[in-house]
């Protein structure tokens, strides 16, 4: 039986609502933070990364792109700019987005917005990590 519940909401939709969770690891601006039962109440800024939550002994992944996490009374609420469950990620589309961003960053002659291209690359990499399509599991 899970000790906590996890809700993930974006401006467009609710990704998870009261999902049972035994543990949650969220990507925060200064690293990753683990949340277990009876965690102290808190609010933190999220960074682009992979949120992991343990359910029935298995960690599940969600790609998140910024926002906030709130912990209160064994309820974890994530308000994310965008979020995508690992099983919903179109890996081919994410790989293509990664390839396009890398190509834009390599092209020194092109007049591109490097900040946007770097952000696009980070988002694509996070989606691929969440989907398990990369060799490593770092946030």
From Swiss-Prot:
Gene3D superfamilies: ATP synthase delta/epsilon subunit, C-terminal domain (1.20.5.440), F0F1 ATP synthase delta/epsilon subunit, N-terminal (2.60.15.10)
InterPro entries in UniProt: ATP_F1_dsu/esu_C_sf (IPR036794), ATP_synth_F1_dsu/esu (IPR001469), ATP_synth_F1_dsu/esu_N (IPR020546), ATP_synth_F1_esu_C (IPR020547), ATPsynth_dsu/esu_N (IPR036771)
Assigned keywords, A-Z: ATP synthesis, Cell membrane, CF(1), Hydrogen ion transport, Ion transport, Membrane, Transport
Subcellular localization: Cell membrane
SUPFAM superfamilies assigned: Epsilon subunit of F1F0-ATP synthase C-terminal domain, Epsilon subunit of F1F0-ATP synthase N-terminal domain
Principal place of residence: membrane
Function field: Produces ATP from ADP in the presence of a proton gradient across the membrane.
Protein name, entry field: ATP synthase epsilon chain
Organism taxonomic ancestry: Bacteria, Bacillati, Bacillota, Clostridia, Eubacteriales
Gene: atpC
